[in-house]
């Protein structure tokens, strides 16, 4: 991935964030965050009190009240700034995507073939179902499916990858994205969306936050923060008559300062920024999430369904051996295997053709000149082959070929069964070749498990995440590779229906399931999974069914997606712990300052030895505002992530952010008190 990463504090972003922070001071904007709305209301009230004191309408220290009011406004501004900075980083990422959208004309065909008559129309007028012709050098005008042709496509504007990709009709690489450019040849594309609904439009809307809604965990935490705010508001409201009855009424300014310091303003001010930054970090990994809910769900996932090919193994299986059945010549097996693979464009199919050529000098033959019919592989049949000169040759998985043989009145030989087991026990994939009802033998396909993947699965296991390998291989091959890779479980001979059933089974047990997919046959399982990462190179159906799209089309990215989701949840939890813990230190600063005149015994709580009641209150309010600024980098970058169990993670958080939340305010408030005293403001 070559997408440029934004620095944490770009000067342009800082200026824009400051401007947006001021704009967010409106009551309508503040009302969306109840905790900060209370601070905003306190700021307005103390500002009015300051003006009244300056004009002599009421008695009191205008300087003290004015400084309190100023720092309350700073508290609101700093919270606005954190949110605006997070949104600004996302908008900057979106601007690079907007540059991809260009006003252009499209060749809309009157019939679904490349030589049909075409009309030049603005790309914005294209509708779902329209057929367009795109030639070399053109920008693809809409999202769609290739129905004819094949071409090299530059998708760097979206994926950040400079290497072109092949898009062609009739397979899992038929999906194209509007805004990408054709480098060679031509494509006939059926538009799959209306204007404003394209993948680019959805990416931009998501990244800019236009479709951002609070996630369930955010809503639950917001309710908790509101409840705490109401409790502290009621408690503070009772303190005025309580102190007045004692003969020394506490001023409204002090009560407002006390309330603001007691309510959880730190997490209240950073909560929105954490959510926006989480989605931004996901985009930084070249993954587009359709909502914050998807990112959050990634953090709660406890079952990963991982395709074997390309995720656990390198995915470049190569034919390495022909093992004929008893009574069959190896050359005969190789010839049949090559014929069955002539029109198979997969790496495995091409390797079979090449191996037959190397072993027995069997030359490739043109399928069309042979007047043969190629039978393509499907997820349901799990075999492919060729019909030629009254010969019906098939190659495929053991079970598929066994059913084929038995349905044609044949018998599956015991020696071939043994050869299949021997190949599978070595971790290779056996393909069986059959002509009619006669089994000819086995092709050995070798694949290599990715380096370091076993250690990554061990880390996931520490975190309580179960890994399940999904493969179309037979159980013996699957078991051998699963043991080598270190996964917890596997699903062998997988079909789309089996994947869907497995996901539902785990969900019925109360688990959250994540998976990847790229084909139309993956769409039902992607739609069912809690976190569904569709490959950008996959079909439109897969991308619509998933709640994330990986622009790099790298199935291994699912593990990184889970890490980012967990980091976002950890960041939110850590800052919540810190916010609530640092309230304790503020009690020791403000409570003695506010009520020591009425109850001298409370001076015993002044463990920090603060200079005066006024300096104590000012120090607490100033610290309350500054801590938001100091925590913005942590909210945007996320806390440092380590794969730990839930209990170990809880202990780490309580130690770092619970104890830190207790200690840091004591130090910070004392330092501010000393500075205020030196400046003569206390």
From Swiss-Prot:
GO terms for molecular function: ATP binding; ATP hydrolysis activity; magnesium ion binding; P-type potassium transmembrane transporter activity. The keyword Amino-acid biosynthesis does not apply. Belongs to the cation transport ATPase (P-type) (TC 3.A.3) family. Type IA subfamily. GO terms for cellular component: plasma membrane. Mg(2+) binds at residues 518, 522. The chain crosses the membrane at residues 34-54, 58-78, 219-239, 254-274, 588-608, 616-636, 662-682. The system is composed of three essential subunits: KdpA, KdpB and KdpC. Its EC number is 7.2.2.6. The active site is at 307 (4-aspartylphosphate intermediate). It is a multi-pass membrane protein. Keywords: ATP-binding, Cell inner membrane, Cell membrane, Ion transport, Magnesium, Membrane, Metal-binding, Nucleotide-binding, Phosphoprotein, Potassium, Potassium transport, Translocase, Transmembrane, Transmembrane helix, Transport. It comes from the Bacteria. This is Potassium-transporting ATPase ATP-binding subunit. InterPro entries: ATPase_P-typ_cyto_dom_N, ATPase_P-typ_P_site, ATPase_P-typ_TM_dom_sf, ATPase_P-typ_transduc_dom_A_sf, HAD-like_sf, HAD_sf, P-type_ATPase_bsu_IA, P_typ_ATPase. ATP binds at residues 344, 348, 377-384, 395. Part of the high-affinity ATP-driven potassium transport (or Kdp) system, which catalyzes the hydrolysis of ATP coupled with the electrogenic transport of potassium into the cytoplasm. This subunit is responsible for energy coupling to the transport system and for the release of the potassium ions to the cytoplasm. The keyword Transit peptide does not apply. Pfam families: E1-E2_ATPase (PF00122), Hydrolase (PF00702). It catalyses: K(+)(out) + ATP + H2O = K(+)(in) + ADP + phosphate + H(+). CDD domains: P-type_ATPase_K (cd02078).
């Amino acid at each position: 991935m070559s997408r440029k990463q934004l620095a944490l504090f770009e000067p342009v972003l800082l200026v824009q964030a400051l401007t947006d922070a001021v704009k967010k001071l409106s009551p309508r904007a503040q009302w969306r965050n109840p905790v900060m709305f209370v601070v905003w209301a306190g700021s307005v009230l103390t500002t009015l009190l300051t003006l009244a004191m300056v004009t002599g309408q009421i008695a009191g220290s205008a300087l003290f009240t004015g400084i309190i009011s100023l720092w309350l406004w700073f508290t609101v501004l700093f919270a606005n700034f954190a949110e605006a900075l997070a949104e600004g980083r996302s908008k900057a990422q979106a601007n690079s995507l907007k540059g991809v959208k260009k006003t252009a004309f499209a060749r809309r065909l009157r019939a679904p073939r490349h030589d049909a008559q075409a009309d030049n129309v603005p790309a914005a007028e294209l509708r779902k179902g329209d057929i367009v012709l795109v030639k070399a050098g053109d920008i693809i005008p809409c999202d769609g499916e290739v129905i004819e042709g094949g071409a090299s496509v530059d998708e760097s504007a979206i994926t950040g990858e400079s290497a072109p990709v092949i898009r062609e009709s009739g397979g899992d690489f038929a999906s194209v994205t509007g805004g990408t450019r054709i480098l060679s040849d031509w494509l006939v594309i059926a538009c799959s969306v209306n204007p404003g609904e394209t993948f680019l439009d959805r990416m931009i809307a998501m990244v800019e936050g236009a479709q951002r809604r609070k996630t369930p965990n955010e809503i639950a935490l917001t309710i908790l923060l509101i409840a705490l705010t109401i409790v502290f508001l009621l408690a503070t409201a009772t303190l005025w008559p309580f102190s007045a009855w004692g003969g020394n009424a506490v001023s409204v300014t002090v009560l407002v300062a006390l309330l603001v310091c007691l309510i959880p303003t730190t997490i209240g001010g950073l909560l929105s920024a954490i959510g926006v930054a989480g989605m931004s970090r996901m985009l930084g990994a070249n993954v587009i999430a359709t909502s914050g809910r998807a990112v959050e769900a990634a953090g709660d996932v406890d079952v990963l369904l991982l395709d074997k090919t390309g995720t656990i193994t390198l995915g470049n299986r190569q034919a390495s051996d022909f093992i004929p059945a008893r009574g069959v010549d190896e050359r005969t097996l190789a010839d049949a295997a090559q014929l069955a693979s002539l029109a198979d464009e997969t790496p495995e199919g091409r390797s079979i053709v090449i191996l037959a050529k190397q072993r027995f000098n069997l030359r490739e033959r043109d399928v069309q000149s042979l007047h043969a019919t190629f039978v393509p592989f499907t997820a349901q049949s799990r075999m492919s082959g060729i019909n030629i000169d009254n010969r019906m040759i098939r190659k495929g998985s053991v079970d598929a070929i066994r059913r084929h043989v038995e349905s044609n009145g044949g018998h599956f030989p015991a020696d071939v069964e043994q050869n299949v087991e021997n190949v599978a026990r070595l971790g290779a994939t056996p393909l069986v070749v059959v002509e009619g009802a006669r089994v000819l033998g086995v092709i050995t396909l070798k694949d290599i498990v990715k380096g370091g993947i076993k250690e990554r699965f061990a880390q996931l296991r520490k975190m309580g995440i179960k890994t399940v390998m999904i493969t179309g291989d037979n159980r013996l091959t699957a078991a051998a590779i699963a043991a080598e890779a270190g996964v917890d479980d596997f699903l062998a001979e997988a079909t789309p229906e089996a994947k869907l059933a497995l996901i539902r089974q785990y969900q019925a047990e109360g688990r959250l399931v994540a998976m990847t997919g790229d084909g139309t046959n993956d769409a039902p399982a992607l739609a069912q999974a809690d976190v569904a990462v569709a490959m950008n190179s996959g079909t439109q159906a897969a991308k619509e069914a998933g709640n994330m799209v990986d622009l790099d089309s790298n199935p291994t990215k699912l593990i990184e997606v889970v890490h980012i989701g967990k980091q976002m949840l950890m960041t939110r939890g850590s800052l919540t712990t810190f916010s609530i813990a640092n309230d304790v230190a503020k009690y020791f600063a403000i409570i003695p300052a506010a009520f020591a005149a009425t109850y001298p015994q409370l001076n015993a709580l002044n463990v920090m030895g603060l200079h005066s009641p006024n300096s104590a209150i000012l120090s607490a309010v100033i610290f309350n505002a500054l801590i938001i600024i100091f925590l913005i980098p942590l909210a945007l970058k996320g806390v440092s992530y380590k794969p730990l169990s839930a209990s170990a993670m809880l202990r780490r958080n309580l130690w770092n952010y619970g104890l830190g939340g207790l200690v840091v305010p004591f130090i910070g408030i004392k330092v501010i008190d000393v500075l205020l005293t030196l400046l003569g403001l206390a």
